[in-house]
Regions:
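Predominant activation on well-ordered alpha-helical scaffold segments within soluble catalytic domains
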Residues: 96, 112-119, 138-141, 155-162, ...
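A short, well-structured juxtamembrane/interface segment
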Residues: 193-210
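Nucleotide donor/acceptor-binding cores
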Residues: 212-213, 238
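Glycine-rich phosphate-binding "P-loop"
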Residues: 174-197
Length: 392
């Protein structure tokens, strides 16, 4: 698969822009609908847990993708992804507590944290039939989804795990203990695949980063960071421009990472994007979700950066793991469930002044050039075609 991807990359550098009918690589994964609306008593009413965690958003993978990705892991089994459920001294098991334990790990995606928490539910379950186990998992899944109703990844991770429980016919012919063991193994394996996906994306993107180029980055994406770390480790000379990313100033954090790597970096105020775009060769962004249209949901400001880049004929590259593909089809910005964040202007704001607090926006596919995923290099139209076919 990777040799095909490499050929695709080299052709891109010598030929006109990609045709929408470019031959596809392995089909993207599918995802169940996200953003359910149960009441959430554990999060602040005005600030979403999405903003508080700043976690990446993920979706559902197929069993074929799991088999393919497992082979790519090359035997790596990080100890940080294996954990026995706490004895608790008789304390009732809490799926939210287990989820929070995994969510706090810096390199673990939020969807994988949900998978690990649901795997722990299986370990603690005293169910004697698959039906009883499914009921317990459904209740735990709904509890996790209600923790933050705006999180695409959280809902997707729960849907992923439930998919394996309800759609795997092989488990019907096994005793409950064997079935539990197999489901637990799948959850742990998915955690390993999550880390491997970023390394694969970093490898695929290297042919697009050339010596002397200037890259504009918006937000703090762990995938984009891995891409640039790999390029720097490979001896490539490039410069990075980071937007400040107000109000949470993710650009400051990203610029510090670049400085640690001895990569020349310039920090921009958000309003200086158009001013600086003329000296930029490409734009690299991550994604909280890749939707059916081929567009992306990402940190607020991504849309306007893509608009400026498009008007000045600069390529916009998206680095996103394939399990972020979401079965969503926003038509405009208002179709997104708001993920609110606190904003401090440094001065008192009159009560009559309305403040926009949304943390993310939607970028349509026509403003994106390519998506780098662990399945290969995809055009936005390929994402759209595959997701539509998967859910017909």
């Amino acid at each position: 698969m990777w040799s095909r991807s490499a050929s695709f990359i080299l052709d891109k550098r010598q030929q006109p822009p990609l045709d929408h009918d470019q031959k596809k690589l392995t089909p993207p994964i599918k995802m169940a609908d996200a953003l359910q609306n149960p009441k959430n008593p554990t999060s602040p009413s005005n600030i979403s847990a999405y903003y508080q965690t700043r976690a990446e958003h993920h979706a559902v993978v197929s069993s074929d993708w799991l088999a393919q990705a497992q082979a790519a892991v090359l035997g790596e089994t990080p100890e940080t992804h294996r954990r026995s459920v706490r004895d608790g001294g008789g304390k009732p098991f809490s799926v939210i507590e287990e989820f929070n334990y995994w969510r706090k790990k810096p390199d673990l995606a939020e969807a994988v944290a949900a998978i690990m928490a649901l795997a722990a539910v299986i370990r603690c379950s005293e169910a004697t039939t698959m039906m009883e186990l499914e009921i317990e998992l459904t209740e735990a899944s709904n509890t996790l989804k209600s923790w933050d109703t705006t999180s695409i990844s959280l809902s997707a991770g729960c849907d992923l795990f439930m998919r394996y429980v309800t759609r795997t016919s092989a488990l019907e012919h096994e005793d409950i203990f064997s079935a539990k063991s197999r489901l637990i193994e799948r959850g742990e394996r998915f955690g390993e695949i999550s880390l491997k996906a970023r390394k694969t994306i970093a490898m695929l993107s290297q042919d697009f980063i050339f010596d002397g180029c200037t890259i504009l980055v918006h937000g703090y994406s762990r995938v984009v960071l891995e891409v640039l770390k790999t390029a720097a480790a490979g001896g490539k000379n490039f410069k990075v421009c980071c937007t400040e990313g107000r109000p949470d100033r993710t650009g400051l954090r990203f610029s510090k990472e670049m400085a640690t790597l001895d990569v020349p970096v310039k920090l921009l105020i958000d309003s200086a994007v158009a001013y600086t775009m003329d000296e930029v060769d490409m734009v690299f962004v991550g994604a909280d979700g890749v939707v059916e249209s081929g567009g992306i949901i990402n940190m607020m400001g991504t849309y306007q950066i893509a608009l400026v880049a498009h008007s000045m004929d600069k390529p916009v590259y998206v680095a996103a793991e394939s399990y972020k593909f979401a079965r969503l089809y926003p038509l405009d910005q208002k179709d997104l469930s708001p993920a609110l964040r606190p904003i401090d202007f440094g001065v008192p704001i009159p009560s009559k002044v309305e403040v926009e607090k949304s943390a993310r926006d939607y970028t349509p596919p026509q403003y994106l050039t390519l998506l780098f995923t662990d399945l290969g290099v995809l055009t936005p139209s390929v994402v759209s075609d595959e997701l539509i076919q998967l859910y017909l």
